[in-house]
């Protein structure tokens, strides 16, 4: 097969420590890559690379199914999900499966079904991966030309991109269908403390949906992370799904324009770097979403956000001291500001104390107590419901930092419980993964650009000191 560059330029120079270790058709001499370079050995073997990817998908789906069943087996319905270290069941609950009013789990069978379906799927994927890795054709170009490709074939690459975009669009519409027709999804804002409901009044106005993208990412605005109702979330998925599907059709039917042909590097490693860059952005956005957003990630399942736990503490002590006779509207704190309530610089009534920094929190247990100018004093005196008190006391002691007030407290704080919030885990893991994927993006982009520019990449190991040393054994 013709390649874009000489083999010397296309592959880095890497020398095996043990030159006798070889796999037929997959050794360093025939591929230019040592065994530990993994899928790089399969750059020009589309059939074997397909096997590697399908097997990888099988591993991912197997983990999802096994972890799902593990969480079901350990689940205690009497305790909130976020106290049990669960990271998969909260996602299923958010989709409206197995939960009732207030986020209470009423049926774990759907979770069991989900785990089993993933395990069965992983077996199918695993079989396909092993088949294509060991038995199927090494290259697909001859026997299955539709599935074959050459990395530098720009038209074929954009066709593959288009197929991927259509699949992503279909995925977005699956969520829309679930929310509209198949039982609905969990809405933390439903009256009385959250419930599963069908979304009937989708937001499809482009000014609203795309308005989020034009917001500042900082406090009070919060870019797309500030979305606080399911109508906008599901409507956004209608827009996203439509854009992905029409974009996919566009990329299948067209060839890259001249400016795109000039601007991009067209090689396997370049596509890898583009993908890693995109995944990095996804990771950082997911981190912000799960840390700050309590609509897409309801606090009933993931635990409170940091600001939510802090505001819950202020609310809990306001309720307590008001019952003991304190006048919460006028009591002064040690700094001369309001002890329980104060005014923000723009005039709204907000909670006083160190939680003032979180004045822009919106949470379903707190919003009913607001009026046109922030917190409503008469509602705070007469309208507080028992479920709001219970929920705020629970959130106060379950801050995502493992501290009482999520600001300066520590895990040993007297009223806190020793637990790790899934919100912390999901935010931190996605930040770390986003960072490493970004480093991988830079690494592979640099190598791809170097190869395209025609100079050597990788380390020349012909004169490496280790080669002149005695073998370890």
UniProtKB/Swiss-Prot annotation:
Known role: One of the components of the core complex of photosystem II (PSII). It binds chlorophyll and helps catalyze the primary light-induced photochemical processes of PSII. PSII is a light-driven water:plastoquinone oxidoreductase, using light energy to abstract electrons from H(2)O, generating O(2) and a proton gradient subsequently used for ATP formation.
Name of the protein described by the UniProt record: Photosystem II CP43 reaction center protein
GO biological process, any: photosynthetic electron transport in photosystem II
Membrane topology: Multi-pass membrane protein
Matching SUPFAM superfamilies: Photosystem II antenna protein-like
Modified residue annotations for N-acetylthreonine: 15
Family: Belongs to the PsbB/PsbC family. PsbC subfamily.
InterPro entries attached to this UniProt entry: PS_antenna-like (IPR000932), PS_II_antenna-like_sf (IPR036001), PSII_PsbC (IPR005869), PSII_PsbC_sf (IPR044900)
């Amino acid at each position: 097969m013709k390649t874009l560059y000489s083999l010397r330029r296309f592959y880095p120079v890497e020398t095996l420590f043990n030159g006798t270790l070889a796999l037929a058709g997959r050794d360093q001499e025939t591929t230019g890559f040592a065994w530990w370079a993994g899928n790089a050995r399969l750059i020009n073997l589309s059939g074997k690379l397909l096997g590697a990817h399908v097997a990888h998908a099988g591993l991912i789906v197997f983990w999802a199914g096994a972890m799902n069943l593990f969480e079901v087996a350990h689940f205690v319905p009497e305790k909130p999900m976020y106290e049990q270290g669960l990271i998969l069941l909260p996602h299923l609950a958010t989709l409206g499966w197995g939960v009732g009013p207030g986020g209470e789990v009423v049926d774990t069978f759907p979770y069991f079904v989900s785990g089993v379906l993933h395990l069965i799927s992983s077996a199918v994927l695993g079989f396909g991966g092993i088949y294509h890795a060991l038995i199927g054709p090494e290259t697909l170009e001859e026997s299955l030309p539709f599935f074959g490709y050459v990395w530098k074939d720009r038209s074929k690459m954009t066709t593959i991109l288009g197929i991927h975009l259509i699949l992503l669009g279909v995925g977005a519409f699956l969520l829309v269908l679930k929310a509209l027709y198949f039982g609905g999804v969990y809405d933390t804002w439903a009256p009385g403390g959250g419930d599963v409901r069908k979304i009937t009044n989708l937001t499809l106005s482009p000014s609203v949906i795309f308005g989020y993208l034009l917001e500042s990412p900082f406090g009070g605005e919060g870019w797309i992370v500030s979305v606080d109702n399911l109508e906008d979330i599901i409507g956004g998925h209608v827009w996203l799904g439509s854009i992905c599907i029409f974009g996919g059709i566009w990329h299948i039917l067209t060839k890259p324009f001249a400016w795109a042909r000039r601007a991009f590097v067209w090689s396997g490693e370049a596509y890898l770097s583009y993908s890693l860059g995109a995944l990095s952005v996804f990771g950082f956005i997911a981190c912000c979403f799960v840390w700050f957003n309590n609509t897409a990630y309801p606090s009933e399942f993931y635990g409170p956000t940091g600001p939510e736990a802090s505001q819950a503490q202020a609310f809990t002590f306001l309720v307590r001291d008001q019952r003991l006779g304190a006048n919460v509207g006028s009591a002064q704190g040690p700094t001369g500001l309001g002890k329980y309530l104060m005014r923000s610089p723009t005039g709204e009534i907000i909670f006083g104390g160190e939680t003032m920094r979180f004045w822009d929190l919106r949470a379903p247990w707190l919003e009913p107590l607001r009026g046109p100018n922030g917190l409503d004093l008469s509602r705070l005196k007469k309208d507080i419901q028992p479920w709001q008190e219970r929920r705020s006391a629970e959130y106060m002691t379950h801050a995502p930092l493992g501290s009482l007030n999520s600001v300066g407290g520590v895990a040993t704080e007297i009223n806190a419980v020793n637990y790790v919030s899934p919100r912390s885990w999901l935010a931190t893991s996605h930040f770390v993964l986003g960072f490493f994927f970004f480093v991988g993006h830079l690494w592979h982009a640099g190598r791809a650009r170097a190869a395209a520019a025609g100079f050597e990449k990788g380390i020349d190991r012909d004169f490496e000191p280790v080669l002149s040393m005695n073998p370890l054994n």
